[in-house]
Amino acid sequence: MLYSIVKPWLFRLDAERAHDFTLKNLKRLERSGLLNLYPRPPKCKQRQVMGINFPNPVGLAAGLDKNGAYIDALAGLGFGFIEIGTITPRPQPGNPKPRMFRLPEAQGVINRFGFNNLGVDVLLRNVAATKYKGVLGINIGKNFDTPNERAVDDYLHCLRKVYPYAHYVTVNISSPNTKNLRALQEKEALGQLLHALKQEQQVLADQHGRYVPIALKIAPDLDEGQVADIAALLMKHQFDGVIATNTTLARDMVQALPCAQEAGGLSGAPLRDRSTAVIQSLSNHLAGALPIIGVGGILSGEDAEQKIKAGASLVQVYSGLVYRGPVLVDDICRTLG
């Protein structure tokens, strides 16, 4: 109810400014205790995925809280799990502003943030200070100036750093806003990366006395052969999960709209069908070998249900929150039960 009142005012602001304003005020509400008055979503059936017990299947996708600065506030909205990041070894400013654009006629968002973040050490200080005891995923990436030939070093650095703090780790090789990042999805490069990460995961599990699952986040702009290759590599290297999908470079569904030709990744409702198709394809190739977390274009409980029917075990939201607000979590929980 409250979000529907403030949304018209927020939409008058620059999209990134509205994003930051909302998070800062949500944090103020949490610190004042007023967020405790927000009604919790209905009870959902718990899910066990990647060996983790998720209190409900609705998660927050990476990108909203890049530095883990708002975990406690976001937890008050009833998510079954929260994913923070994408984080890189060193701080970086990301791409020049403006870099986030709404397409309200299509309920879409375009962003070209470029992994703007304060670096992995700042994120870990924020995580250490949180009161949150729920399921926390940490999404890791490479710095923009790290060449792909050395990308594995950035991912391993972040994996070692976040391992003691995360319930699961997501490897982001699918953002369209870091030059050549998606080339890491190609068969040879991906095989080398997965092999190195899997080896390090076992070393860290022995070192810390606990196993932290690793998931791979992939793009929606893949053909059937590419999806098949990725699925085969995930199974070969015994990865724990896959998140489908990131944002799309396609514009065919919004090409006539203002801002549609802005560079960056498109998310929200225009991504829905493309994302679901990748989930269905992955599900066919994986045949239950590892779980899928579905994300992309979820703006209702019915949208989430379609992801589950396509083969996802859990779902995540981000752009849907821009248009629906926190009631979206409640809607999905009621639909999925």
From Swiss-Prot:
- List required co-factors: FMN
Q: Which EC number(s) are documented for this chain?
A: 1.3.5.2
The record gives the membrane topology as: Peripheral membrane protein
Instruction: State the compartments where it is located.
Output: Cell membrane
Keyword Membrane found: yes
Q: Which residues cross the membrane?
A: none
Assembly behavior: Monomer.
Q: Which NCBIfam families match?
A: PRK05286.1-1 (NF003644), PRK05286.1-2 (NF003645), PRK05286.1-4 (NF003646), PRK05286.2-5 (NF003652), pyrD_sub2 (TIGR01036)
Function in brief:
Catalyzes the conversion of dihydroorotate to orotate with quinone as electron acceptor.
Name of the protein described by the UniProt record = Dihydroorotate dehydrogenase (quinone)
**Source organism of the structure:** Methylobacillus flagellatus (strain ATCC 51484 / DSM 6875 / VKM B-1610 / KT)
Top-level taxonomy = Bacteria, Pseudomonadati, Pseudomonadota, Betaproteobacteria, Nitrosomonadales
Question: Which gene holds the coding sequence for this protein?
Answer: pyrD
